[in-house]
Amino acid sequence: MTKYTVFLMSGWILSAALPSLAEEVLPLSSALREGLKNHPDILAADAGLRIRLAETLAVTEIPNPRLEAEFQSLTDKPVIDLKFIQPVKRSYFGMRRNYALIEQASAQADARAQIAGVLNDVYSRYTELWTVQELQALRTQNREDLLALRDSFEKSVKAGQGGTVELALLDAEAANEAAEREALETQRLSRSAALSRRIGRQSGTVITVERPSGLSLPTDSGALERFAIRRTPLRLALLKREEAARARLLMAETDRLGPMEAKLLAQQDTDQGRLLLGVGFTMDLPIWNKNEAAIAGARASMDAARSELKQFEPARVSAVVKLRYQSALSAEQSAIRYRSEVVPLFEAALSQARDAMAKGQGSISQLQPIINRLTQTRMRAFELQISALEARAELEGALGGRLEEALATSVR
């Protein structure tokens, strides 16, 4: 037994001796469902929604009336003065109530807009974890292929058809693949923890994920473009935000005259037994302060919402979705072609070379380039798979929803 074989065995024995954690296979659908319930952004959006809904109540509150009473006794003619005072703004008459209703709808739309971002975040974390798992599996497969050649290499060395250097290099490559796989374990555990946090898992179970393939892309982007134009949650939220800002601006302009106080006056003359009634008012004259700050703030909010809405004009949305679709389709086709055509050719070449070597018709020097090219080809196929998943995620970001939802909607 060579020192390289001893190194390989000791590495695997050491890794097997480490404490193992319970693992659970989590489908993508379950991860998305749990994320919608427990994602930190969802919880924060729910809390923010409750705060905004409570704040709208303050807008509709009308100050309580104030009662002032004075008792005067001038010699033998006591007088009682009563003043009933009600603070008034023009916006109290229906306008604030209307703004509150629109603002409540805007707050709810903003909360719903968080859903698309949460789904994309969970999908990204899920894909990141799968990436590490797949890379570990790739390293394992490479190592197994190398070890499967070891007996043939050893026989060739004994038969004088190869040198010990090639055998040592084979052992070194196998050891490297094993070490690379173990080095990825830290990343796997870290990404499992990140996904667990996003979906609200509190146990110490390590999550194992499945390949997030999803549905195949449609033959054209027409249905996806229509879905994005009609369904984008962020666009709906911006529409409500612009409507709320417009109502707020109208309310601020209405209150340009400033607050007023309406008064009902009553005076009881106890000496003559008469009750004198009167009305009056006080108001701030809009000379220096014309509510410009509130008006400017409301107008800025409205302009900001309108500027953001321009990004979601149908023509722009359609163009972005079309580009994302073409990118995702190209990436997916490249990944499929490489995985189903190129990799099997190199695997077949290695198998043929191994069989020839077993029959004494080949040499170690012929196998080594094939092994290297197969390893490179598998890594390239893996990179193309990642690119395809990333392109799909970007497409779903442009859609404002999951691809499955868009395709299901187009069938109805």
Each model region followed by its residue ranges:
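Acidic, low-complexity, intrinsically disordered peripheral segments
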Residues: 21, 380-412
